[in-house]
Amino acid sequence: MGSDEEDFVFHGTPIEREEEIASRKKKAVAGASGNLRTLPAWKQEVTDEEGRRRFHGAFTGGYSAGYYNTVGSKEGWAPQSFTSSRQNRAGARKQSISDFLDEDEKADMEGKSLSASSQFDTFGFTAAEHSRKHAEKEQHERPSAIPGPVPDELVAPVSESIGVKLLLKMGWRRGHSIKEVRASSDARREARKAFLAFYTDENTKETPDSLVSETEVETSLGEDIKISESTPVYVLNPKQDLHGLGYDPFKHAPEFREKKRSRMSANKEVGFRKPLSMKESLFGPKSGKIAPGFGIGALEELDVEDEDVYAGYDFDQTYVIEDEQPARQSNDNRLRLTSKEHDVLPGFGAAKNSDYSMERFNPPIIPKDFVARHKFSGPLEAETKPTVSAPPEVPPPADNNLKLLIEGFATFVSRCGKLYEDLSREKNQSNQLFDFLREGNGHDYYARRLWEEQQKRKDQSKLTLDVKVSPTVQKMTAETRGSLLGEKPLQRSLKETDTSASSGGSFQFPTNLSDTFTKSASSQEAADAVKPFKDDPAKQERFEQFLKEKYKGGLRTTDSNRVNSMSESARAQERLDFEAAAEAIEKGKAYKEVRRATEQPLDFLAGGLQFTSGGTEQIKDTGVVDMKSSKTYPKREEFQWRPSPLLCKRFDLPDPFMGKLPPAPRARNKMDSLVFLPDTVKAASARQVSESQVPKKETSIEEPEVEVEVENVERPVDLYKAIFSDDSEDDEDQPMNGKIQEGQEKKNEAAATTLNRLIAGDFLESLGKELGFEVPMEEEIKSRSKPEDSSDKRLDRPGLKEKVEEKTSSLTLGSEEEKSRKKREKSPGKRSGGNDLSSSESSGDERRRKRYNKKDRHRNDSESDSSSDYHSRDKQGSRSRSKRRESSREKRSSHKKHSKHRRTKKSSSSRYSSDEEQKESRREKKRRRD
Amino acid sequence: MSATELPTKEAHILKGHEGAVLAARFNGDGNYALTCGKDRTIRLWNPHRGILIKTYKSHGREVRDVHVTSDNAKFCSCGGDRQVYYWDVSTGRVIRKFRGHDGEVNAVKFNDSSSVVVSAGFDRSLRVWDCRSHSVEPVQIIDTFLDTVMSVVLTKTEIIGGSVDGTVRTFDMRIGREMSDNLGQPVNCISISNDGNCVLAGCLDSTLRLLDRTTGELLQVYKGHISKSFKTDCCLTNSDAHVIGGSEDGLVFFWDLVDAKVLSKFRAHDLVVTSVSYHPKEDCMLTSSVDGTIRVWKK
């Protein structure tokens, strides 16, 4: 083989086979994928489309650097949208010239064709072409199941309808009306016949002409009638002159109206001639003259039918004119009649319905009595009064009766007014007694008297004002005040005068010493100070008493001593009395209720005057603050306060307001505090009388308190009534035991009863809570809640135990032995109670058993009976209650003391910390219980 | 009794509060003491040995008053955060919070059976809260006072409140009546005698006034101490023979109940004495002050 190759020599490139090319491509693709995935970057090679290796864009300028090894095509990575060819397979389109023509050639084809616009499309050809084009467009746009041209191309719209064609054949021309055409056609046919007859027989008789003329006249009349019916009058006879509406220049000259009409007719004839001449010149002999009627369109050509054979004859025209005239005359006559009847302008008619109706308001009617000027009578009368001067004095008339009459009448007139005088004057004209009113006898006296009466009336008005002021003045005087107050100030005033005369010097000293006091007060005090000296020299004992009281005044006594000359022995005695008074005051500070009670009767015995004087002095003194505070403060006030029922329950007390609605909450604002201030001022300023009344008020206040207590206590709850009823029964059974037993036993009994009551109360409270009521009032409620009782009762058992534990811990009773005894005694009661609770029986039976249990307890505990007696006794009266309350408090305090001593012993024995001690105490309690 | 029998000897000083102590109270049997102050804490002490047992922290502001139940299992406290806290003593957990006051709460008290808490507040009202049920609404609101209510005392049938409007008002639940005793001076603190017949009212005119509860009469007046600007305390001894009052100058005064005579006075603290509490049985006394200390006094 090697030798063969060496022999042959090859020239040129060998031909590549397809298989080799395909294999190369495959290799390239595989290599590329392999290179991209497996080979690292520095091992990758740039290859050509055919898989050949090539340099990396060194010679191509880097154009294809990012093409190979990255994307699959030169365009990039944009995928192409897929379109299926199923729809295009079935389509078989016909070829036409437009398919093979270019756009330029198509434009040239379109430009050559000419078409009329829609305005001038009389034959409708343009519309047909447009419709065909539109159909073709639609055919191209929408696909059609049936191949081939659309039927719309075959069917083209037609601009003219069959009706139009028929009319055209019958002689109608566009622009003419249908009615006129018919009438004119008939006339024209007859005209043709006549014309033909005329031309054939020129030398015939005249009779056929007259017949033809008659027929024409009839036809003309018919036409006129039809026209008059259809068209209104003013259209036939339009207004041609320039006169105003309703103006008739020929009203009084009908002759001229006729002449004008002839002129008008002549003008018409001239009008007819002119167009005829023109037409003859234009159209020649054939056309002849045009028939009367509507004109033909300017653009249309004249047909043979339009020619009028009898256009040249004037006779026919004259007949027509004459026929029109009577119609006009008749119209004019109608207008005249309407104008005369309705007074309306000629040519117009009165309207049938007139909506406008104007309301007319007549001017007001002036009363006959009305006077233009307004006269003010008031000011004139007022002005006349002051101008009247006082008439001169006139002596009374001789007759006494007349004098009296005049005086009385003057008073009446002054009161009632001048009218009274005028009326009486008129009434009494005949009466001679009233001549003085008419300037008779006594007129002058009457005038004077009247003036005097008026003056008096004026004065009385002033006097009334003075009278109003006077009572206030009277009140201010000292005498009236004294009289109102009573007799006491009178006595004082008498004494004051004497004292002032006797001791002028002493009067001045107290004012200087006590600037704060008022003069009246100081004067009164001076009088009081001076009083005993006159009486005392006779009785030394009374003098000593007065001195004791005066010592409270202090300075005043010394002043009085200086003024009055006393013996040395008397002064010495006074000093001793002062010392005694001082000792009494000191003791008074430490006084108690008992001492106060003893002192009060002494004050009353001394007398009203002394008591009042002492009070005033104490109030004015500023030195003794304690005494002042003791009397002014403390001040007790009482209000009604309503405790909430739960609060009463927690304190084991009955609610005093059970069954009452809660009152509205009272608003105690700052204003209330302000209101209290004036009361204190009034109290301070109260005088002797008010002070005496105070104790009465106090007594009255105390009484309702007692009543309130009784009422409140008597309103316990039904549950508590059950307890008390049991106690009362026990009292009846054993009334004597309470008295016999000793004091020590009583204490124990009290404790036991309290225990029993507490237990019962808590038990009942728990029942109420669990049932859902705070305090069950009625038996019905209990009966309704029977099914619940069983479950509630089971719950009650642990509750009872818990309560017992709490109470034992809280109680402060004395001996341990007593506690153990009571527990043993109570245990059978509890067990029996549990049995009752477990059974579901009626409430009545339960109550009875409870009562038996309580009775058993009372019987077992003989000590408790006497304590119940105590409680029953408390009910009797409120006074006894207060005393017993104090005694019970003392007993309780003694119990507390004993319990405290025992507790101290226990505490001293313990030596451990608080926690351990508590634990031990609990353990001990448990052991004791066991 | 003579002055020597009064507890004027200092036994212990209880230190631990980091600010003013506003109240110090014995418990029912007198074995322990609870104190509260401006450091927002309540501390449980054994005053007889001067030992701090426990500290309770939950208040957001100063604590003004505390009171323990008679069974020593729970206590309540109030203060500037306008709430009344109901605590468990052993666990130190807040059982419940009573909210409703519009201002600071100045005083709290339990009733005898510990079923109800009554609080006196800056909003001129007394509010009663129920400890048995789980409701947080007040059982009753008493708002007849005209000014801040500073102190409250409870008996078996009555609620007594002292107010800055100068009145001591008694609300009797058995009769349904309110009795208002006007003293004319702002009432700072009220205390009731052990026999329940008298009320001692500390007023801001440096005077203590003893009133008869049934009649409203003024029985006695005690003077000598200074009480014009700060809340000071006053109380009676367990024998009701002496009246004790704190002063703003750090002194403690003992008066005779009947004679109103100053039996003894001694300097207990350097600053204002904020609280005075007497032992329910023995002759022992607690005083607290603004200086942050609580002192125990014995014979």
Curated annotation (Swiss-Prot), chain A:
Polar residues: compositionally biased ranges: 499-508
Primary localisation category: nucleus
Gene Ontology terms for molecular function: pre-miRNA binding; primary miRNA binding; RNA binding
InterPro entries: DUF1604, Surp, SWAP/Surp_sf
Gene Ontology CC, one term: nuclear speck
Residues in cross-link Glycyl lysine isopeptide (Lys-Gly) (interchain with G-Cter in ubiquitin): K25
Basic and acidic residues biased stretches: 489-498, 779-808, 858-877, 913-923
SURP motif repeats: 405-447
Keyword Secreted part of the UniProt annotation: no
Pfam family, one: DUF1604
Tissue: Expressed in vasculature of cotyledons and leaves, young meristematic tissues, trichomes and pistils.
Acidic residues bias spans: 701-711
Keywords, sorted A to Z: Growth regulation, Isopeptide bond, mRNA processing, Nucleus, RNA-binding, RNA-mediated gene silencing, Ubl conjugation
SS bonds (residue pairs): none
Boundaries of every G-patch domain copy: 159-199
Record keyword Protein biosynthesis present: no
Residue span of region Disordered: 76-152, 478-508, 687-751, 773-930
Ranges of biased composition (kind: Basic residues): 848-857, 892-908
Phenotype of gene-disrupted mutants: Developmental defects, elongation defects of all organs, reduced plant height, triple cotyledons phenotype, reduced vascularization and infertility due to failure to produce pollen.
Subcellular location field: Nucleus speckle; Nucleus, Nucleoplasm
GO BP: any one term: phloem or xylem histogenesis
Function, as annotated: Functions as a component of microRNA (miRNA) and small interfering RNA (siRNA) biogenesis. May assist DCL1 and DCL4 to efficiently process and/or recruit the precursors of miRNAs and siRNAs. In the miRNA biogenesis pathway, associates with the DCL1 complex that processes primary miRNAs (pri-miRNAs) into miRNAs. Binds pri-miRNAs and precursor miRNAs (pre-miRNAs). Is required for the interaction between pri-miRNAs and DRB1. Required for general proper plant growth and, in particular, initiation of vascular development.
The protein's name: G patch domain-containing protein TGH
Gene for this chain: TGH
